């Protein structure tokens, strides 16, 4: 059975709740002692994992819509991407304010440069910022063919974000490995497109070097 436009609207409502409820839980946990012995780290990891979940969900939409023949599912992709950016912003903010502190924000730039896993994280966040800012239909029309070129960078985020997560934990546990494995699987479903993008970039680089 094909999804109707009305059903997609209700699906979006559910996805908004899926983005909001973890935040409400986090607020409750902070105020009622629901976090672990290191609440700052717990907040950072929770916000980062939630951002990664929405990233993977957004990447799942296209192959799911194709294989299930539910093209209206594509309408939920932007929503998932925006929630990914929102949670990634909370993740960055929690590190800046809770780990470094308001009085040490001047150290943020140095930290992002000197710690490789933070460098990967901030690169991912900047890409997500650009994708969120240009996610509207008006920006899509304004950018034309460059819009898709820009939004292909989501695949780079799908590589960098799991590495950032794996690199940030002191002890490798199954959880970050599962996220990394899911990211690899979702990218593998697009291997033809990714191979085409790689060959195009290599050709462009070769042409520039030949000038």
From Swiss-Prot:
Family annotation (InterPro entries): Fe3_Rdtase_TM_dom (IPR013130), MsrQ-like (IPR022837)
Q: Report how it sits in the membrane.
A: Multi-pass membrane protein
Q: Keyword Disulfide bond: yes or no?
A: no
Question: Where is the chain membrane-spanning?
Answer: 8-28, 82-102, 116-136, 153-173, 178-198
- Localization per record: Cell inner membrane
**Which cellular components does GO assign to this protein?**
plasma membrane
Quick one: a GO biological-process term for this protein? protein repair
Q: Look up the record and name the cofactor or cofactors this protein needs.
A: FMN; heme b
User: Is Nucleus set as a keyword in this record?
Assistant: no
Pfam families per record:
Ferric_reduct
Copy out the cofactor comment: Binds 1 FMN per subunit. Binds 1 heme b (iron(II)-protoporphyrin IX) group per subunit.
Q: Mostly located where? A: membrane
Sorted keywords for this record are:
Cell inner membrane, Cell membrane, Electron transport, Flavoprotein, FMN, Heme, Iron, Membrane, Metal-binding, Transmembrane, Transmembrane helix, Transport
- Extract the GO molecular function terms from the UniProt entry: electron transfer activity; FMN binding; heme binding; metal ion binding; oxidoreductase activity, acting on diphenols and related substances as donors
Function as written in the Swiss-Prot or TrEMBL entry? Part of the MsrPQ system that repairs oxidized periplasmic proteins containing methionine sulfoxide residues (Met-O), using respiratory chain electrons. Thus protects these proteins from oxidative-stress damage caused by reactive species of oxygen and chlorine generated by the host defense mechanisms. MsrPQ is essential for the maintenance of envelope integrity under bleach stress, rescuing a wide series of structurally unrelated periplasmic proteins from methionine oxidation, including the primary periplasmic chaperone SurA and the lipoprotein Pal.
In which family does this protein belong, per the annotation? Answer: Belongs to the MsrQ family.
The annotated subunit structure for this chain is: Heterodimer of a catalytic subunit (MsrP) and a heme-binding subunit (MsrQ).
Q: Can you name this protein?
A: Protein-methionine-sulfoxide reductase heme-binding subunit MsrQ
Q: Which gene encodes it?
A: msrQ
């Amino acid at each position: 059975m094909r999804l109707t436009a009305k059903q997609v609207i209700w699906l979006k409502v559910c996805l908004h709740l899926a983005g909001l409820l973890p935040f409400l839980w986090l607020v409750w946990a902070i105020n009622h002692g629901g976090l672990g012995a290191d609440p700052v780290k717990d907040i950072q990891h929770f916000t980062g994992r939630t951002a990664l979940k929405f990233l993977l969900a957004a990447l799942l939409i296209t192959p799911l819509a194709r294989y299930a023949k539910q093209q209206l599912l594509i309408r939920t992709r932007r929503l998932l991407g925006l929630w990914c950016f929102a949670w990634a912003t909370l993740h960055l903010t929690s590190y800046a304010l809770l780990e470094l502190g308001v009085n040490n924000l001047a150290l943020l730039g140095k930290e992002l440069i000197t710690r490789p896993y933070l460098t990967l994280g901030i690169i991912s966040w900047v890409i997500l910022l650009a994708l969120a800012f240009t996610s509207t239909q008006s920006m899509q029309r304004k950018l034309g063919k460059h819009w898709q070129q820009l939004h292909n960078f989501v695949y780079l985020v799908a590589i960098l974000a799991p590495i950032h997560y794996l690199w940030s934990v002191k002890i490798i546990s199954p959880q970050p490995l599962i996220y990394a494995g899911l990211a690899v699987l979702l990218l593998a479903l697009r291997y033809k497109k990714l191979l085409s993008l790689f060959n195009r970039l290599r050709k462009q680089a070769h042409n520039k070097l030949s000038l």
